[in-house]
Every structure is written in structure tokens, then in C-alpha cells.
Design a protein with these regions (language model features):
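Membrane-interfacial catalytic/cofactor-binding modules of polytopic membrane enzymes
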Residues: 53-124, 160-221
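Membrane-helix and juxtamembrane interface regions of eukaryotic multi-pass membrane proteins
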Residues: 1-77, 81, 102
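Alpha-helical transmembrane segments and their membrane-interface exit regions
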Residues: 141-150, 195-200
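Membrane-lumen (extracellular) interface motif
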Residues: 2-30, 102-103, 121-138, 152-161, ...
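Transmembrane alpha-helical segments that form the membrane-embedded catalytic/substrate-channel core
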Residues: 39-54, 148, 152, 176-184
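Transmembrane alpha-helices of multi-pass eukaryotic membrane proteins
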Residues: 22-45, 105-113, 131-143, 161-175
Length: 221
């Protein structure tokens, strides 16, 4: 889905398309990438959960859901604090603790997303493309102001962000900055790396053909 022109990497932004269509294409790629990122750890978690319960006799309560329908989040706090996976929660909070000594609770939020940016940057170093830390820093870093804005809204109005408006706000904010994050991984070579599903025929060929047809349709608009 990415385009070339970047050494060993690609980009989700097709410069040959008008800006609105170009951004629409990039956003769709970001959405599909997010669902893939959701599906892979979910599958791995399930593959561990089933034998742990059926064979080892562990209590299902020991294996709570890895995700809680993240697409239903009605605020950024809801998305990151509960609905997205919490595998690295303690690492992020520990990393945010130093800033809390200066900025209080806001420092924990800011520091946690800074740590997240660093960890995702480290994963990019395993790829062969153009690695740019600033994309992770801005992409994940901007989640903190969004959450702090929700807290400020609650303090001013006494109402929490939620409902349909909250859902729209959450999805727009995630997609705007998510584009930057996915672009960073695309430039680092994520879309060109070998994965377990590269030989998953005929599904792989079908997805590739659909992506090509979609690009042709976008250029025909």
C-alpha cells in the first residue's frame, strides 16, 4: 500500500493525488494498519489463553481480554486507559513518573507518551528504511495534549467527554496523528518487510489486487 521513492522504505502519501484524496488514501491505510496491529497481538494472546485455561487449568479471570473494543472509545482517555491493550502500561507509567515530580498528574500523561514514542522508535531500528524519531515523538506525544484537553473540559464543565461527539473527537484525533505514526513506520520499511502472511495465498494476492484496484480508482476520481 505504500509508495517508493524512499530508500528501503515507502510513504502512505501519494504525491500524484490531490491533497484531499491523498489524505483520504493515507487515512484509510492508517485505519487498516491499526486493525492489523490490533489483530496480531490479539491472535497471539488468544493462542496463549486457550491452552492456559484448557490444559493448565488456569482461571479465565487470569486472562482478561487484551482489548476492549477500542473502536467504541468515546474519549482519548477511554481509548488509551482502558480499551487499547495495557501490556506496557506499567513501563509507560514508570517512565512518566519523573515528569510528575514537576508537572503533577499532567507530567505522568506527558511522560508516558514520551516513553511510548521511544519504545516505538526502538522497534523501527529493526527495519531497514529511513528511521525518523521526530515522527514518533510528535505522533505519540500529541496524545498527551488531547487527554489533557479532555481533563480541562471536565474541570470547566463538570462533564466528561463522551457520546457521539466524543467518539468523533477521539477517532479524528487518533487518525490525524496516527497518520504521522504510520508514515514513520512506512518510511522505516514496515510495508516492505517480510511477514508471516506474505505467502498466505490466495488471501495475499486478493488483498494486493484490491489495493491496486483501489489506487487505480483514486487516480480516476
Amino acid at each position: 500500500m505504500g509508495l517508493g521513492s524512499i530508500p528501503k522504505g515507502s510513504t502512505i502519501f501519494d504525491e500524484t493525488l490531490p491533497f484531499p484524496v491523498r489524505y483520504l488514501r493515507a487515512t484509510i491505510i492508517t485505519m487498516l494498519t491499526t486493525f492489523a496491529i490490533y489483530a496480531v497481538p490479539q491472535i497471539g494472546y488468544n493462542l496463549c489463553t486457550i491452552p492456559a485455561i484448557l490444559i493448565l487449568g488456569q482461571d479465565p479471570a487470569q486472562w482478561p481480554p487484551a482489548f476492549d473494543n477500542p473502536w467504541r472509545a468515546t474519549s482519548l482517555s477511554d481509548f488509551w486507559g482502558r480499551r487499547w491493550h495495557q501490556f506496557f502500561r506499567h513501563i509507560f507509567l514508570l517512565g512518566g513518573y519523573p515528569l510528575s515530580l514537576v508537572f503533577g498528574r499532567a507530567g505522568i500523561v506527558i511522560g508516558s507518551f514520551l516513553v511510548s514514542a521511544v519504545l516505538h522508535y526502538i522497534t523501527q531500528l529493526t527495519l531497514d528504511g529511513q528511521v525518523e524519531f521526530w515522527r514518533m515523538l510528535v505522533g505519540f506525544g500529541m496524545m498527551a495534549p488531547g487527554i489533557l484537553a479532555e481533563r480541562a473540559y471536565y474541570q470547566l464543565t463538570g462533564r466528561r467527554v463522551g457520546g457521539v461527539v466524543g467518539w468523533v473527537w477521539t477517532m479524528v484525533w487518533l487518525l490525524v496523528w496516527g497518520n504521522m505514526i504510520v508514515e514513520g513506520f512506512a518510511r522505516a520499511g514496515m510495508f516492505g518487510s517480510v511477514s508471516f502472511d506474505d505467502n498466505a495465498l490466495p488471501a495475499g494476492l486478493m488483498v494486493e489486487r484490491l489495493a491496486m484496484d483501489f489506487d487505480v480508482w483514486l487516480h480516476a476520481i
